[in-house]
Regions:
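His/Asp/Glu-rich mid-to-C-terminal helical/loop segments that flank catalytic regions of hydrolases
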Residues: 205-246
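Short acidic/polar active-site loop segments enriched in Thr and Asp
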Residues: 76-77, 174, 193
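Active-site rim beta-loop-alpha module in soluble metabolic enzymes
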Residues: 126-170
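Zn-dependent metallopeptidase/amidohydrolase metal-coordination segment
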Residues: 178-216
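Generic hydrophobic/aromatic pocket-lining and core-packing "Φ" positions
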Residues: 67, 165, 181-184
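Metabolite-binding pocket within alpha/beta catalytic cores that recognizes anionic/polar moieties
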Residues: 1-123
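Short, flexible loop segments at the rims of nucleotide/cofactor-binding pockets, characterized by
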Residues: 54-59, 153-155, 173
Length: 246
């Protein structure tokens, strides 16, 4: 089963048949709501990353509980949605990027299931190539899509400074967000295939002279919700049930 992690706005009850709403207890805390739905003959689990009322800021999201809970309900592949700031010269608002790698600038987040034993998980290919391919195909018919890129994750909840963005760009970052890590790493530890669709909502700090407020960003994200739903719908249909990735 494919799991979708994203904002509450990408869930459209009109286009799916709701089968169940599950509250999942985990060793890391309870996950109050995972919706199991069916569309086009496939069951999908939807988890609102920021909670039912979108009230949990990025640095307070219980990433371990979320990934653990999805595994418990039978998810073996995840499609994550991320609104990001564009850093790369080739990106502009409205573009879609499917990342192949990430940079981690978070701090203090619970980022592993292996606190009590020594385990070194390979993340040389952190994003599942088969889910990435499904996302690339789905997004390519809807928007301008970049099939490779590096996602840089910062701690939040504040926006980055222009100097921080220059540093991230120098290190190879193409987009910046606040939620993709440790989510991708935890999925890897649980042997769940993981792919991300990044929607460029704005230029990152210092890339454009225009300043962006949190309210404006929220409005831009809402404007992109319909596009994200279409990409996810297409991708879910194209993700192979049996994947060959390691």
């Amino acid at each position: 089963m494919i799991g979708i992690i994203g904002g509450t706005g990408i869930y459209d009850p009109k286009s799916v048949k709701e089968i169940a709403v599950k509250e999942v207890e985990t060793p890391y805390g309870d996950v109050p709501e995972i919706k199991i739905v069916e569309f086009n003959g496939k069951q999908v689990a939807f988890l609102p990353r920021h909670g039912k009322s979108h009230a949990i800021p990025p640095h307070r999201v219980n990433y371990r509980a979320n990934i653990y809970a999805l595994k418990e309900v039978g998810v073996d592949g995840i499609i994550s949605t991320n609104s990001v700031g564009g850093i790369g010269d080739f990106l502009k608002p409205g573009d879609v990027m499917i990342p192949h790698d990430f940079l981690d600038f978070t701090r203090g987040r619970e980022s592993t299931f292996y606190d009590d034993r020594v385990v070194h998980v390979d993340v040389s290919s952190p994003y599942c190539p088969e889910i990435r391919n499904a996302l690339i195909r789905a997004a390519g018919s809807i928007s301008k899509v970049f099939s490779n890129g590096v996602y840089a994750c910062t701690q939040g909840p504040r926006f980055e400074t222009p100097s921080e963005i220059r540093m991230i760009k120098t290190l190879g970052g193409d987009v910046v967000g606040m939620t993709g890590v440790p989510e991708v790493v935890l999925a890897r530890e649980k042997e769940i295939c993981y792919g991300s669709v990044c929607i460029v909502a704005n230029f990152a700090a210092g890339i454009s002279e225009e300043k962006l407020t949190a309210t404006e960003l929220t409005e831009i994200v809402k404007e992109n919700e319909a596009m994200v739903r279409k990409i996810i719908t297409g991708a879910v249909e194209n993700v192979p049930e049996h994947r060959k990735c390691e």
